[in-house]
Amino acid sequence: VPNAQPALEGRTSFPEDTVVTYKCEESFMKIPGKKDSVICLKGSQWSDIEEFCNRSCEVPTRLNFASLKQPYITQNYFPVGTTVEYVCRPGYRRELSLSTKLTCLQNLTWSTAVEFCKKKSCPNPGEIRNGQIDVSNGILFGATISFSCNTGYKLFGPTSSLCLISGSSVQWSDPLPECREIYCPAPPQIDNGIIQGKRDHYGYRQSITYACNKGYTMIGEHSIYCTVNDDEGEWSGPPPECRGKSLTSKVPPTVQKPTTVNVPTTEVSPTSQKTTTKTTTPNAQATRSTPVSRTTKHFHETTPNKGSGTTSGTTSLLSGHKCFTLTGLLGTLVTMGLLT
């Protein structure tokens, strides 16, 4: 049999009624409707068989955008010159200017398939208030669009939608989401102060201003604003503090009290005056004369004990200066720390 080989399966003898089947050689296909086997008849004769193998193209190429029409789906014999026809798959539309047919060529290959079916387009997705739609992948069949919200808003609903087949057309798999404004919690209150311009809600970038009550000083920022972190509202920082003014305490000046000073002193003797070293004692009291009607007062020196090198502090300081005004005296005593 031309272009075919019998499948003997190792047999060398063929008794009467033995059936032998043939198989087409490579690049040949069995012609539909023709027998591919013979039988051993009486008298050791084989039954007649016609040529049943012929050159044929392989099963037509599978196309992503189209499928074979019904008569060609189960066919496996495609001799040279055979033409097959396609139909657009769901989700695609026909390009009327292009042919939907392919032909088996002499080299047993199919003619090149042009894209005679184009993807259908989903409807315009529209807009999201306070949000964005990413359509960088297009809106044709099989495309995915994604949704996002502007800063300060939170997305409620699907984050994406796919263009899918819906009946004889295509539609989006999910509706548009909603972008809702994010609010910060109620602003923190402060002691001894107020919040100026309070409102019911505080959205993204909205601020509040603090003010201190009279007599208090603000420590920190006067204003804070609403910001967003992981789709949750939070304040930009802590509130300020209102602190009372501190009263300055009166601290007496530090006075260095000398232990030994050199002052001029006059002895009771009417004819001599000399300088001696006197040691001051802060707790000693000065002896003064009876005050007169004016503010000038006279003080008299107390003669020290013989053999002693010290006198009372007041006496030693006033020695040689017989007259002091009351104001000057008081100032001296304050400086010495004897009066406060």
Swiss-Prot record:
Residues 235-317 are annotated as: Disordered. PROSITE patterns: SUSHI. The Ser/Thr-rich domain is heavily O-glycosylated. Disulfide bonds join 24-53, 57-104, 88-117, 122-163, 149-179, 184-226, 212-242. Keywords: Cell membrane, Complement pathway, Disulfide bond, Glycoprotein, GPI-anchor, Immunity, Innate immunity, Lipoprotein, Membrane, Repeat, Sushi. It is found in: Cell membrane. Pfam families: Sushi. Glycans are attached at residues 54, 107. GO terms for biological process: complement activation, classical pathway; innate immune response; negative regulation of complement activation. Residues 269-287, 307-317 have a biased composition (Low complexity). Monomer (major form) and non-disulfide-linked, covalent homodimer (minor form). Interacts with ADGRE5. The first Sushi domain (SCR1) is not necessary for function. SCR2 and SCR4 provide the proper conformation for the active site on SCR3. This is Complement decay-accelerating factor. The gene is CD55.
